[in-house]
Amino acid sequence: MCERVGFREIHYGGRDGTDANKLYVNGREVKLRGTCRHDVSPRGGRSTTAQEDWDEISAYRDANINHIRTSHYPPSRHLLRACDELGMYVEEENSACFKGANGVDIYAAPEEFLSPFTEMVERDRNHPCVIIWSLGNESGFERTAGFRMEYDYIKANDPSRPVIFSYPHTVETLPLPYDVCSRHYEDVNGVLGSPSMPVLHDEFAHIPCYDLDELRRDPNVHNYWGQSLRRGWERLFVTDGALGADLWGGIDDVFPLPEGMEGRWQRHSQGTWSGYGEWGCVLDCWRRLKPEAYLTRKAYSPVRLDERAAVSYGGKLIVPVKNWFDHTGFAELKLMCAVDGGSPCKVALPAIEPHAEGLLAIDVPEGAQSVALSFMRGAREIDAFCIRLKGAARAKSAACDCPPAISQTRDEICVDCRSARFVFSRRSSQLVRAEFGGEVLLTGGPHLHVTGRELGAWNTYRAPVASLVDGQAVVVLHGSYGGSPRVQFVLHINGDGSFTVEYQLAEGSWRNAELAEVGLAFDMPGDVESVSWEREAPYSVYPEGHIGRGLGTAQRVCAPALEAGYGAKPGWEWQDDMFNAFEFAPDDPAGGLATNDFRTMREHIRSYEVSLAAGRGRVCVKANADVAARVEMAPKGARLIVDMLWRYPHLGWGNDMGRELSLLFGGALGAARIELGAGK
């Protein structure tokens, strides 16, 4: 048998004068940017091919991951060979999982723990990628002699690698059976390190997957998760004694079952596909990149550059930069620079050593507005940035000096503008329709929009009023939802048809940990075709089509996805999915109405434009990056939602869920600026 081997040296536990709370590979401290992973194949279930294993590890490397935890069993030989060749560290775990903890008993003899552990060690000890041995996952150490037998065996046969065990809090005897302390789902703002030994958060920042209602309502939860990892990793890297993190998990645990198969042991889904859930930080079950893949790549990036700290002076752009590689100096990288969208050219990088920082100095011509930077290692891009030097002037809407006209009948209030018309019902105290150029763009509203609390039916308790004030038509609508809460909407309509709507609650207070969105909504016709937006995004560069991009257009329909239908093998990207056979049942009326990209809430918008089919018209929300917007489709129509407050209360598992929402009645809750226009 021919076996490829490699050489490297590990220091841990304070050996040779090193720090006891750090792990060293070849003399340098390492920080593990990791993920857990299961074996998942759309064709083979839990059985993967050599090519699938290689492609998986390659995708992790592209996401700036340098470590995997083989939860909760040894991987295939193919996967370890891929890790050896691609430079991926491995925590290899014995197949002892959920034994004697969390209410689970133990039915195996101690020897049955030792046997698979010794087989794993003897099979894989020559792989240099394996740097940590794991005795088992989330188990009670003292409930069996098996775990102590594993520890004694490994210390007698391979003391060169450290040992980890989860749960360490169940250990009551000495010597401690681990050299690295395992911690699961520590809060991203919590205690991350230790002065006595390295802490590896080998289950961290769980990817959103369990609350299907949240996932079905708004795909932006995938995007929102990224801020937890970014914040958590920035704290982990600089925390003494924090070895790193392994996200849960790497690839979606979802299995597209063959048609007609009824038997299944896992029923987490609402659709026909089975599995634990869509918990992949990089790949979905079809091995497509998920939105989390780019967010993982950015959060884990070893090139740390803050565009906001860049300074342009004397024909040079000065940029502070940090090297968070463990063994790679910046001299080994290539930096490509493009000014104002021009051809990229190579720029010399300073020789910044690992875990050090310095300054980039880049020549830029006078009057340059943007500088795009791409850091390369060979042919692989590590990270990319775009630094804006001069903000382009934002176009201002031309003022209309022709005020609107108000006419009233017994049943309606009409506001006529230059190209727009608003009709309000006196009976319901609601907008009946809003037209622009003769096309109906809004069909109802405004509505108080909340998720996480049921509202009663709208009833008016006071007739609407309208009058001209300072050249605007001001319309005041009063009503309540099932008697409470009472809400007042005030619309200020300009002569060009643009308007601002303010709303406030009239009495009491309202606090609910389940609240996820608070804002207002308008009904729209069902032939919405696309949404376009500009927003303040966390990153300056995104891949084409990423749901988090700062500027973009999302089509409601992906023709190939719609034609293929429910449960089909995709020939398109994740963001263009219209059917999800894990989240939606085949007959769910909410499924198949729009793409993931279209349904995603856009946070911190400056503009959010909804376009109707055939150029019939458009509705645009204008803001100062302080609101969020999305369109919710239904079989018989659409609803434009503008949120002033939002969070994701079911992210949990150590993630940042956003601040709990509370509403004080009697105070203004918020406002939205909306423009109506002709189609483009």
Where are the language model's segments positioned?
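Beta-strand/loop-rich accessory regions of lumenal/periplasmic or secreted enzymes
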Residues: 394-680
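Low-complexity, Pro/Ser/Thr- and charge-rich linker/hinge segments at domain boundaries
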Residues: 8-28, 387-409, 529-534
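Terminal connector regions
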Residues: 366-397
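Solvent-exposed, conformationally flexible loop/turn segments
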Residues: 313-314, 352-357, 658, 664-669
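A short beta-turn/strand-edge loop motif at beta-sheet boundaries
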Residues: 325-332, 510-514
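Intrinsically disordered, low-complexity Pro/Gly/Ser/Thr-rich segments with frequent PxxP/GP/PP motifs
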Residues: 338-369
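Extended substrate-binding grooves/exosites of carbohydrate-active enzymes
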Residues: 2-316, 320, 326-331
